[in-house]
């Protein structure tokens, strides 16, 4: 396994944001529903995307991925998704429902992904059963068989799960009758998935609200679609520029997708100027502590919690960050403490006492966003930091070394 060697740097300049990983993956899973030619543009070249493409190839789709464009043709033929692919990421489970819709059955292993606490597929399975599927779990495998769906089905999610909302919305698109998802997740990536499916002839409305209504259609057409920008990547670079005391533009983004982050940065002493499709961040000022509640969208995203903790670790005063989405998402704190941060966790709340400096050392990333946060910590720390378990970041950040270097950051990828 490789690692990143990171040195103290002030980030300055402009960074162009890639397409959203968390849109591209469910959109690619949804291509199972169409046998026509599809072109998906602005797809980031990431390990997770490569894994999803390999899954689609294994089940029969013809896929070409070049220059951030995925071209797909053909129908699915194989209802079994291999364990060695599914174990690599959670989003792979989203092929289970669509595959069973087309072939009448599917067999998918329970998924892997980031180790950040309990992320059960229970909500997915509950919803699939509501849609009339028979679901059995044996020896880590999920067997799904298509049954008879009622004309009108209401699925009330116990928690606004992004993955379950996307999975059930996609699955219901080609199922007869009406499906209503209550307490749906509201993330922009769900709106993007709805727009993609509707561009092919689906009849879905309400994405972006707590209630999504799907009127089943018989088939989906082909077409072209462009994935939205990655708001989490945008937020990561905005926090990195601010934390290092630099200045720069986050470009080719949809600023309203990160309104809560811009507010937090402003309140803590970072200057933020919002333009049409880019945001200017000036982190030269002194930073102040703040309290943050991590919540589903439109609240502060859990996928930016590790990064904002690094930023707050050098802010004056005390900050409290309450994690309400993934209660165990604090594995990065031990590594930050080793670098000199003063952070402790009490009942799902990170209490941060700002310090004057962090010091470089060897650290290990435990998941995608935690590893990105440790790279930011390496940029603000004195000396050199080695961030190990590079594969985590390669799952979710396209060209991260090149982009940080373009901002005048000192980083090297040792393979």
From Swiss-Prot:
It catalyses: phosphoenolpyruvate + UDP-N-acetyl-alpha-D-glucosamine = UDP-N-acetyl-3-O-(1-carboxyvinyl)-alpha-D-glucosamine + phosphate. GO terms for molecular function: UDP-N-acetylglucosamine 1-carboxyvinyltransferase activity. Pathway: Cell wall biogenesis; peptidoglycan biosynthesis. It is an enzyme of class 2 (transferase). This is UDP-N-acetylglucosamine 1-carboxyvinyltransferase. Cell wall formation. Adds enolpyruvyl to UDP-N-acetylglucosamine. One of its GO terms (cellular component) is cytoplasm. The active site is at 114 (proton donor). It comes from the Bacteria. Belongs to the EPSP synthase family. MurA subfamily. The keyword Transferase applies. Phosphoenolpyruvate binds at residues 21-22. It comes from Thermosipho africanus (strain TCF52B).
